[in-house]
């Protein structure tokens, strides 16, 4: 039976350390990190995520602000607001909650954020730094997973890692971070031939395909470490992952649950990156 990777407990531990670091810097400089989150429209899931981010920022001792904009906000208005925060040195992190309404171009919005304040790590400049082996801002979910590996003593060097899912938010940066730790990485997706066979060779399996219970025990090697990034709802509205937890946990050595696994770590890493952006602003 697999040991559970408790993302909630680890996130709380790291959040406590972050609050201590923030308090020390405030004592020394009289300043605190500032994080602004921009929410356009009334997407219920987005409202929950934004509330969690605000709560986490306040718990870390940050200044936190949420800009709630109506659904009909134009792209020009949104870009203008972002530029206001780009130019304001009191704010060190800018997060725009995705998805945005259909009439707004996500890419144009992400490009508009100052790369130094892009704590999501989605700006092409930050992606390029990650690919070139000089990461500054890293997408928070992969960063959280790497923190889990560190905490639970998961050896990466020389290991075979398979990532299922090729998004810019999780799959691609995850593969890059694993490569940087000298794992041998295979990046796969829904159209990969013989996907189960490929996955079954993995010592470390990261699943971010966005399909409920997609990965069964047929995908998993005995003793593998399994990270489930999925957030799906079943027919009863229950939150489930991309991994069939009950059967995979019988053969994995370590596994993340859904909920309580990767999700809490993502928010904590956003806070950590806001703190680091604040520190860099003090040094510049």
UniProtKB/Swiss-Prot annotation:
The keyword Oxidoreductase applies. Its EC number is 1.5.1.5, 3.5.4.9. InterPro entries: Aminoacid_DH-like_N_sf, NAD(P)-bd_dom_sf, THF_DH/CycHdrlase, THF_DH/CycHdrlase_cat_dom, THF_DH/CycHdrlase_CS, THF_DH/CycHdrlase_NAD-bd_dom. CDD domains: NAD_bind_m-THF_DH_Cyclohyd. GO terms for molecular function: methenyltetrahydrofolate cyclohydrolase activity; methylenetetrahydrofolate dehydrogenase (NADP+) activity. Catalyzes the oxidation of 5,10-methylenetetrahydrofolate to 5,10-methenyltetrahydrofolate and then the hydrolysis of 5,10-methenyltetrahydrofolate to 10-formyltetrahydrofolate. This is Bifunctional protein FolD. It comes from Streptococcus gordonii (strain Challis / ATCC 35105 / BCRC 15272 / CH1 / DL1 / V288).
């Amino acid at each position: 039976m697999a040991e559970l990777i408790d993302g909630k407990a680890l996130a709380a531990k790291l959040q406590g350390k972050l609050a201590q670091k923030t308090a020390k810097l405030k004592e020394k400089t009289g300043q605190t990190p500032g994080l602004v989150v921009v929410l356009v429209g009334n997407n219920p899931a987005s409202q929950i995520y934004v509330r969690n981010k605000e709560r986490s920022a306040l718990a870390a001792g940050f200044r936190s602000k949420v800009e709630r904009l109506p659904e009909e906000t134009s792209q020009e208005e949104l870009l203008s607001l972002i530029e206001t925060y780009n130019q304001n040195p009191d704010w060190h992190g800018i997060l725009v909650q995705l998805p945005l309404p259909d009439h707004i171009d996500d890419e144009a919005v992400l490009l508009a954020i100052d790369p130094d304040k892009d704590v999501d790590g989605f700006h092409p400049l930050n992606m390029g730094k990650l690919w070139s082996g000089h990461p500054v801002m890293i997408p928070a979910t992969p960063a959280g997973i790497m923190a889990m590996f560190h905490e639970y003593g998961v050896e990466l060097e020389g290991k075979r890692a398979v990532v299922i899912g090729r998004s810019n938010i999780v799959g691609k940066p995850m593969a890059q971070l694993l490569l940087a730790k000298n794992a041998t990485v295979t990046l796969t997706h829904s159209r990969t031939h013989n996907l189960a066979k490929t996955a079954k060779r993995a010592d470390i399996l990261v699943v971010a395909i966005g399909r409920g219970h997609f990965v069964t025990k047929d995908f998993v090697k005995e003793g593998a470490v399994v990270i489930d990034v999925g957030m799906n709802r079943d027919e009863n509205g229950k939150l489930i992952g991309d991994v069939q937890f009950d059967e995979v946990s019988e053969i994995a050595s370590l596994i993340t649950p859904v909920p309580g696994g990767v999700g809490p770590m993502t928010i904590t890493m956003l806070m950590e990156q806001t703190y680091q952006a604040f520190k860099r602003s003090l040094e510049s």
